[in-house]
Amino acid sequence: MSHTLALHPVKKRDAIFLWVLLGWLAFALLPSWSLDYGLLESTGEEILAAYGWSQFNISWLWYLLPSLLLVRPFHEARREQGGRHYLDAGWAFFCMAFIVASATLEGRGLGYATIVLFVALGAIMTLALTRLEWLGGDRFVIGSLTAIVALIGIFIVWPSIAIFIPMFTNDAGEFAPLAFMNVLSQAHIIQVILNSIMLSIAVGVGCTFFGLVLAIYTTRIARRSAIIGRIFSILPIVTPPFVVGLGVTLMMGRSGYITEFMVEWFGLTNTNWLYGFTGIWLAQVLAFTPMAFMILDGAIKTIHPSLEEASYTLRASRWQTFNGVFVPLLKPALANAFLIVVVQSLADFSNPLVLGGNFDVLATQIYFYITGSQLDYLAASTLGAFLLLFSLLVFCVQYMWIGKRSYVTVSGKSYRGDVQPLPVTLVWSVVALLAVWIAFNALLYGSIFYGSFTVNWGVDYTLTLANFTKLFGQGMSDGAWPSLLDTLLYAGIAAPITAIFGLLIAWVVVRQQFKGKKTIEFTTMLCFAVPGTVAGVSYILAFNSAPVYLTGTAAIVIISMVMRNVPVGIRAGIAGLGQIDKSLDEASLSLRAGSLRTITHILLPLLRPAILSALIYSFVRAITTVSAIVFLVTPDTRVATAYILNRVEDGEYGVAIAYGSILIVVMLAIIFIFDWLIGESRTSRSKAKNQA
């Protein structure tokens, strides 16, 4: 007698029950409404009033609506029950929209419990889409994509929209479609706009020219002195805002030694000649030329020497080869460098503040509208929107037009050819310009470090430690210590988040195929195009009212640091993933390892140098940023650059320069330590390969 054994699959408990339960636990244990003074500084009565269950209000409905999803079988539904899964995803999205809309109408901010509830609803959407087998039914991929879209929408798209809202409202808060014309019709504002555009174009031309000079020297002329290029690629990154402008002031300001020399030897009468267009242009060219240099340096290295060799073979002279072959191949890089510098010049806030004089630009004008004696959101929004639109136009030209053109010179042919000599006149001109550039920068940074040790620049050059004593000799709770420690803390939190978030976006963009992939990449890269001043104002407008109150908190400072630098993590991740064959991922997945395990065990070890580079760059940029967070900091959330700004506004240039010098030394030390660690890891891997 035989028996047939039927194997029935074990039915799993539906995880949606657990996520709904998590939402109710958050409702019971955490405040559903925001607290004006935070969880640690609020009174017991304020905390109790923030709990949703403390009184009957709309927040009860926030948790009751998701509970309707519990009207279902206890066990997990199958793939065939597609209607059920679409209902789960749609209902979760509806609950999110209802929470945001009702909190906005109530005029109250969302609390910690609602953050947990949003996570639970997002998880329910992820489960539903996974069961529908979207993107292959990979839960991690769908969850990552959901989180990316949500964060981009909240912290990039919404602030970019929020900055336009005050443009169309009057003083009474009523809709006024032409309110912004009252600002743009002012003669002073028109002049400010023209000043900004004229300055940015002039700076773009200057930086592109000097960047090309530096790039030609390091790639085609220098042999052992190519380290100069590396020095100039690091210095502007670690130089805090205001420091370059202050250094130029020490050299050529009213009491600068170059100005005094010109007065004594050439009879100069106008000692204020630096302040205005000339001073801003000079400081920005010094600050942004290394950015153009890095772009052009990489472009020149990719030019195939065989093309120039072919030109010489056809009896072309050195100048004909340079003008007919070399320069045309650099056109996309030249345009790219020019456009990026134009955007950086428009966004620059620190140098015009120090050297502007009566020459007003958009970035400083927006700052004064927000922090001046008379708050004017309409004017700040109008100028910010104009600056944003102009920067986006430049960015779109760079991204869509230049990015689509082909200037390929590296083919599959094995013969590469030899680099041909440049015209002798060009070589000597480049060397002469480079000598002037090096001498000027040596004087600049020498003045910065020497000026931090003087009593009063231009009056008393006696060496002293008074500036450093005022900064760091008054105890840990006074002077510069609080701002320095807070800055290191915020940057230390923001840097790993930036690197991880950027790598996650890069992995989704490079390794996954779905509709809207280009939109996600383009939207995240907009962070580079949005000027820092505009980003700061937009965050104030977006997160200073219901349903999300973040202004005045450390969270908004950290979020700003992350979102401003996340494109760096994305680009580092895309570059790193481009060097890793996709077959490694496929082999891992074929062995039933999930996407998360593949990332942690396969990709992350291989991407370690790229991650460390993104980490250190994000850390340094977070420390030196000013234009975005200057609007977001408070006395309780102090940062180093805001402290330097306050010293500049108070005329304490010596203290500001001393603080900047300390930051330069600290960040250079951090960069070289990380560079040494990356180099050690590469060396150890190379030794392991050789031994194998």
Give the residues covered by each predicted segment.
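A short glycine-centered flexible hinge/capping loop motif at secondary-structure junctions
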Residues: C207, L314-A316, L591-A593
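A short amphipathic helical element positioned immediately N-terminal to and/or at the very start
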Residues: F175-S185, L463-G475
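Membrane-water interface segments at the C-terminal ends of transmembrane alpha-helices
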Residues: D14-L40, N57-Y63, D88-I115, I142-D171, ...
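Glycine-rich helix-loop "coupling/hinge" segments at transmembrane-helix boundaries
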Residues: L250, F349-Q374, N456-Y461, V626-Y653, ...
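Juxtamembrane inter-helical linkers in multi-pass membrane proteins
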Residues: S317, S406-P421, W457-L471
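Transmembrane alpha-helical segments of polytopic membrane transport and secretion proteins
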Residues: M1-L22, L68-F94, F118-A147, R224-A226, ...
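The alpha-helix within a helix-turn-helix
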Residues: S311-Y312, S588
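Hydrophobic alpha-helical segments
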Residues: S67-R78, I340-L392
